[in-house]
Amino acid sequence: MPLNLRHRHFLRLMDFTPTEIQFLLDLSANLKKAKYTGTEQPRLKGKNIALIFEKTSTRTRCSFEVAAYDQGANVTYIGPSGSQIGHKESMKDTARVLGRMYDGIQYRGYGQELVEILAQYSGVPVWNGLTDDFHPTQILADFLTMLEHGEGKRLNQMKMAYLGDARNNMGNSFVEGAALMGMDLRLVAPKAYWPEQKLLDEVAEMAKKTGAKITCTENVEEGVKGVDFLYTDIWVSMGEPEEAWEQRINLMKPYQVNKALLEKTGNPKVKFMHCLPAFHDENTTVGKEMAQKYGMNGLEVTDEVFESDASIVFDEAENRMHTIKAVMVATLGQ
């Protein structure tokens, strides 16, 4: 491979250079093509991979498992109730045990410091499948999807608006990704939900080098004008008190992605993205409860937009697997 990322961890995007991120995206596209054409070569044969999930998941777990199987690796799934991490055994000790048995470890859980401890003490590549602070594998999938639907534009020629809760792990990772790849990113959210200033300061130098433009605004019209992509995420997380839901939903209502908001972009070819799961209809227990309680047509996005031709959310979901495969092959492959 032209770049050597072997034995590197994948904990957050700012640990990499723009060239390295582009390399991972190019590798993802090549691996995707190989899978579709039946020409994929297994480069993880004989490797054993541990998947630690302290938070449940559909896309991340399936992506890591299918990617590993495609490449000839074996996986062990360690679910939220399947380990002693933090209860009877520290992450430091867990890292030193698993590092003796496995060639690579994925972690999806809470504090960023936990995945960093795992990386520090395991002695094998560690991949961040999501923490409270960052979700780097999702951003890789998003960037690949944007390149596929960007009509030939490079990332540094693209404009994207991220609406809703921009202080979460997705907002944080988009800030890092946009800075690295020279993008025009608008974080369109209530001021209380803008990213921490500390993070914006951290990426400022990189953004200057790449020509990235990162803007925080409460003004929906200004934020979405002329963008190529509209992106949102769920407004509330399971486990938060119900009072927090009501307050958050009322605050976020102006940032819902609906048909009127798409029209405000002035771009008839604008695309809609979402990392999923999405509360767009009443076909889930939570979605039905939210619709009845708040009288809304969807929460962060309406069903009309979610099911429209503008929506590329399922291309995006598929690309989780191809980009995760690229990360594992680049850092662990033979």
Curated annotation (Swiss-Prot):
Gene3D superfamilies named in the record: Aspartate/ornithine carbamoyltransferase
EC number, as in UniProt: 2.1.3.3
Keywords: Amino-acid biosynthesis, Arginine biosynthesis, Cytoplasm, Transferase
Signal peptide residue numbers: none
Residue positions binding L-ornithine: 169, 233, 237-238
Record keyword Cell membrane present: no
Physiological role: Reversibly catalyzes the transfer of the carbamoyl group from carbamoyl phosphate (CP) to the N(epsilon) atom of ornithine (ORN) to produce L-citrulline.
One of the record's GO cellular component terms: cytoplasm
Annotated pathway: Amino-acid biosynthesis; L-arginine biosynthesis; L-arginine from L-ornithine and carbamoyl phosphate: step 1/3
Subcellular location: Cytoplasm
Molecular function in Gene Ontology: amino acid binding; ornithine carbamoyltransferase activity
GO terms classed as biological process: arginine biosynthetic process via ornithine; citrulline biosynthetic process; L-arginine biosynthetic process
Record-annotated disulphide pairs: none
Enzyme class: transferase
Family listed: Belongs to the aspartate/ornithine carbamoyltransferase superfamily. OTCase family.
Positions contributing to carbamoyl phosphate binding: 57-60, 84, 108, 135-138, 275-276, 320
Enzymatic reactions: carbamoyl phosphate + L-ornithine = L-citrulline + phosphate + H(+)
Name of protein: Ornithine carbamoyltransferase
